[in-house]
Each structure stands twice: as structure tokens, then as C-alpha cells.
Amino acid sequence: MAAPWVLPAPLSPAQLKRLEQHRYSSAGRSLLEPWLQPYWGWLVERLPPWLAPNAITLGGLLLNCLTALPLIASCPTATEQAPFWAYILGALGLFIYQSLDAIDGKQARRTNSSSPLGELFDHGCDSISTVFVVLGSCIAIRLGTNPDWLFFCCFVGLFMFYSAHWQTYVSGILRFGKVDVTEVQIAITMLLLVSAFCGTAVWDYKVHLVGLELKFFAVVGILCGTAVSCFNYFRIIFGGGVGKNGSTIAVAHMTKSEISLQDTAFIGPGLLFLDQYFNSFIDEYVVLWIALFISLFDMLRYATGVCLQIAAHLHIHVFRISSHQAPEQVQNHND
């Protein structure tokens, strides 16, 4: 058996017991969803019945990350012009990820393999993918020319993801707005295609009527969407993450338990804070790499520990459809 610091068991017996009572519940329908449902239905019918939903989710995440990496590597400051194929690859990877993310739940219901582990796996992968999607969109419109806006757009995506699951933690229902994640992913796919065929310089074109570059219209759209979504989320939160944080709040909601204030996820940011506090006595670039590896290791060990622990408790497999499956756990908004 692996040491606890390598492969922890984050959930208590009481949390695992409450996990059995969890039922996924969602409400709302976004604008594009009715139009995409036939495509998603057709796509899921092409999948073999032995393919596990979690394998679909993980495959989509890996594809999205791998297709975004060439774009990130080509544009380290989000001001460069990447090769044509990098934008096409990023757009294709994001579209495929969106498609797979939409059908993993359908495959679970189709094969009678729905479980709390599948919901957690889906949200956990989304929390990681959010980082790459946001970076891809910022690179597509060359937002690195305005570092303040780049910083804002990167973190507003993570904040909105966390807030969506925060209101789910409070209300027990994952709510979808008219403009939600599907619309955002399709819009970013279009941004990548425009940058591929027109070049990123097109986003620097200034609209003389208002004196603003085209890229700022995208930022204004983000601002408006954020304001509306925040109003809807916090109206529920006050009335009642991302990365590991996004997974942690999903686990807390599903196990009906409190979120721990002490978390090893704070080690990486803590190192960066201390290095700044002591006037960068260690090179910032070195500390950033150290924080990255610590955070990556911490996220992987937490996610692996939770998935294996839940799978063992429910007597199911993570990446295989088991002969014994948990009872139906889904109350969906769009089926």
C-alpha cells in the first residue's frame, strides 16, 4: 500500500456513506443546447457500449490540453503570431473536447453506469480544462499586449467556474444560464479560427467610432457575461475553483460535508508569496517552477486518491464499465 502522503484517502467513512445518497440535479437550458442535442445524440450512438464514460471524459481533457500546448508554447507572452496549424489544432481540440464533455453523461445513462464518481470526474476534468481554454482565448486575441486585461480574463474564468459549483454546493442544483459553458466554448473556437485565417493582427484593428480595438469588444463581452452570471450565482449563494479547488468543492457538495480551510493546495501560492515578501531571495522563475510541480503533484495525488476511494466504496471501476453499478444517480435538465 502506498504511503498516505503519496496516495491519500481524503474521504472519511461518514462522507463515503453520504456520497451514496447523492443525486445529480441540474436546471436550465442554454441557447445552443437545443440545436446541438441532435448532434450529441448522434455522436453518442457511435460509441461502443463497453467504453466507460470516465474514459471519454479523460480522453477529451487530454486532447484539449495537448492541442492547446503548441499554441501556448508558440506564444509565451500572448503577443506573438503562432503558426496557422496551431490555431486550427487548438480550435479542433476544443470542439472535440466540448463534444465529448457533452456526451459522457449520455454514455453513462446509455450503459446504466451513472455514479457519483462520474460526476466528480467530469467536474474535476472541467476544472483543469478551464485553464487551457482561457489561455487559448487570450492568445487568440493577442491580449498579452494589455497584461492587466490578460490577468483579469485568466482569473475571471477560474472564478466563474468556482462560483458555479459554489452555488451548487449551497442549493444542490447545478444551474445553466442562457449563455453558459457551451456558448463560451463555441465562441472561443470561433476566435481561434478567426486568428488562424485572418491573423492575430486583426484584433488590433481600432474601431474609430468608439476608439477601441476589436479585442476589447471580446473583453467587454466577458465583463457583461461575468456580471450577469455573478448576479445569478450570488443571489443563490447569499440566499441560502479551479484545479484542485474546483474538485474540492464538488467533493464537499456530493458528500454533504464542509470544506476544510487547511489545504495543501496553498503550499505553491504560499511559496510565491513568501518569495515576494522577502524581496525575491530566490529567483522568481525558479520558485514558479517549484510551485508548479508541487501544485501538480498535490492535485494528482488528491484526484487519484478520491477517485480510487469512491470506486472502491461503490464497487465500480474508474475506467471500465462494471457488471455491478450504482443505482441511477441523475436528474438531468436536458434529457
Curated annotation (Swiss-Prot):
Q: Where is the active site?
A: 123
Q: How does it sit in the membrane?
A: Multi-pass membrane protein
Q: Where is this site: Increases basicity of active site His?
A: 119
Give the UniProt subcellular location, in the record's own words. Answer: Golgi apparatus membrane
Q: Name the catalysed reactions.
A: CDP-choline + a 1,2-diacyl-sn-glycerol = a 1,2-diacyl-sn-glycero-3-phosphocholine + CMP + H(+); 1-octadecanoyl-2-(5Z,8Z,11Z,14Z-eicosatetraenoyl)-sn-glycerol + CDP-choline = 1-octadecanoyl-2-(5Z,8Z,11Z,14Z-eicosatetraenoyl)-sn-glycero-3-phosphocholine + CMP + H(+); 1-hexadecanoyl-2-(9Z-octadecenoyl)-sn-glycerol + CDP-choline = 1-hexadecanoyl-2-(9Z-octadecenoyl)-sn-glycero-3-phosphocholine + CMP + H(+); 1-hexadecanoyl-2-(4Z,7Z,10Z,13Z,16Z,19Z-docosahexaenoyl)-sn-glycerol + CDP-choline = 1-hexadecanoyl-2-(4Z,7Z,10Z,13Z,16Z,19Z-docosahexaenoyl)-sn-glycero-3-phosphocholine + CMP + H(+)
Which keywords, in A-to-Z order, does the entry hold? Answer: Golgi apparatus, Lipid biosynthesis, Lipid metabolism, Magnesium, Manganese, Membrane, Metal-binding, Phospholipid biosynthesis, Phospholipid metabolism, Transferase, Transmembrane, Transmembrane helix
Keyword Lipid biosynthesis recorded: yes
Required cofactor names: Mg(2+); Mn(2+)
Residues annotated for Mg(2+) 2 binding in this entry: 101, 122, 126
What cellular component terms from Gene Ontology apply here? endoplasmic reticulum membrane; Golgi apparatus; Golgi membrane
List the GO molecular function terms. diacylglycerol cholinephosphotransferase activity; metal ion binding
Record-listed CDP-choline binding positions:
54, 109
Pathway, according to UniProt? Phospholipid metabolism; phosphatidylcholine biosynthesis; phosphatidylcholine from phosphocholine: step 2/2
Q: From which domain of life does this come?
A: Eukaryota
Q: Which Pfam families match?
A: CDP-OH_P_transf
- Which residues does Mg(2+) 1 bind? 101, 104, 122
Main localization of the protein? Golgi
What is the similarity comment for this entry? Belongs to the CDP-alcohol phosphatidyltransferase class-I family.
Q: What is this protein called?
A: Cholinephosphotransferase 1
